[in-house]
Amino acid sequence: MVDNKDLTVNFLPSPTWNRLGVNRAKIRNIPVDGWNSIPVQKEIIEKYTNISDSKIWDSFANIQTGMGEEIDEISKISQSEKIRISADKTKSEKLFFNCKNGENAFADVELYAPENTQLTVFMAMQSAWNANGICAVRTKFKAEKGAKIRLVQLNLLSQNFRFINDV
């Protein structure tokens, strides 16, 4: 039997949302076990997953996302390698996440733009038209002074897929 849990969305404090009474929401019945890493095109894996740990990438551990520490459990279970992309002047990159039928899959993406650079990342989550499962993507980003990061996400998943987008 697979254990399920509820994940809380929006740990970030925001007075407007607090006033409206919707500061937190629950995503129900998320499996605790059975998570895989989302397959990504080979060129991206070769280019961006073996980046050495430096102070900049280490600092991403302190960046909070909307799902907070709860998504960390899924990250550990999936054993997903972090995809780390940084800009040098102006850079554009495409990520295609291919989610498979019947799978729960996770991807961990970190984006960094040094001072006065521009980084654009197009991210497409896709599946077969009749597939089902859960696709979860956590994206953390950091932009230095004068830098810009543009994140364009396309959800091309089947209507039977549940998509968790943790930015």
Q: Model-found features: residue ranges?
A:
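Long, low-complexity, mixed-charge
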Residues: M1-K82, T90
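Conserved beta-strand/loop scaffold segments within soluble protein domains that form the structured core
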Residues: Q64-V167
